[in-house]
Structure formats: structure tokens, C-alpha cells
Amino acid sequence: MAKKITAYIKLQVKAAQANPSPPVGPALGQHGVNIMEFCKAFNARTQGLEPGLPTPVIITVYSDRSFTFETKSTPASVLLKKAAGLTSGSARPNTVKVGTVTRAQLEEIAKTKNADLTAADMDAAVRTIAGSARSMGLNVEGV
């Protein structure tokens, strides 16, 4: 018989840097999950990623307090800020442009995000990422 699911927890945790402090500890603790077990498993799974990049994770908690988790790719906004060398996007994206990204950079980000995007092909994925860049106040070259 399948285990009964009691909760889904969505968090963004820095890759290879999960620890029991907030936000991880309180979110898992209120559902009775072994926090250190999650931290060790998450850090092991994200070892290949660049340390410190925010990584979305969806944790499924079962009635016996066991859990499974699925990691997603880093948010496009974080990758775009990194590609453009920025710390934040524009406060007024339609009027104030804060940086520029090229098609090559967009293709690299689209390859990273491809598993999480619903785009039919790579060109559609690049256009999706380009739309995110424009909404952050970045100029897009070559698209």
C-alpha cells in the first residue's frame, strides 16, 4: 500500500549549503521530518552544482514522517543576474534598463533550465528566457 502524503513543502535552499537554520529547520520541523537527514541528502545531491546558487526543492512528507524530495534548476532570474553581472533587476523594467544579455548567454541558461521549461524546442526556450530578461529590465541582443 502506498504511503499517505501529509504535506508538500516548497523551499529555495542554497546548493550544497543546507543546514538546520531557517528556512529549512522550521519548515521541516513543524512536519516532524528529520532535519539533518534532509540536509545531508540535499547537500549530497546538489554537490555538482555551483555552491551558493539558490535551488528550488519540493519535499514530499509522508504520514510516517519519512520524506522524498525533488530538486529543480536554479531560477532563471538568478542565472540572468549572474550572466549580466548584476545584484538585482531594474525597479522599473520598461523604462530603466540595467544590463544586457546576448543570445549565447540566453542559450546557455535555456540549456540549464531545459528540464523545467515546457518549451517545445530550444528556440522556444530561449524566447522564454528572453522574456524573463526583459521583465527584469535587461536588454536582449540577438533575439
Curated annotation (Swiss-Prot):
A GO biological-process term: translation
GO MF, any single term: large ribosomal subunit rRNA binding
GO CC annotations on file: cytosolic large ribosomal subunit
Organism: Pseudomonas fluorescens (strain SBW25)
Gene: rplK
CDD domains xrefs: Ribosomal_L11 (cd00349)
Keyword entries, A-Z: Methylation, Ribonucleoprotein, Ribosomal protein, RNA-binding, rRNA-binding
Family membership noted in the UniProt record: Belongs to the universal ribosomal protein uL11 family.
UniProt-listed SMART domains: RL11 (SM00649)
NCBIfam families in alphabetical order: L11_bact
Entries under SUPFAM superfamilies matching the protein: Ribosomal L11/L12e N-terminal domain, Ribosomal protein L11, C-terminal domain
Any Pfam family hit: Ribosomal_L11
Source organism, top-level taxon: Bacteria
Official protein name in the record: Large ribosomal subunit protein uL11
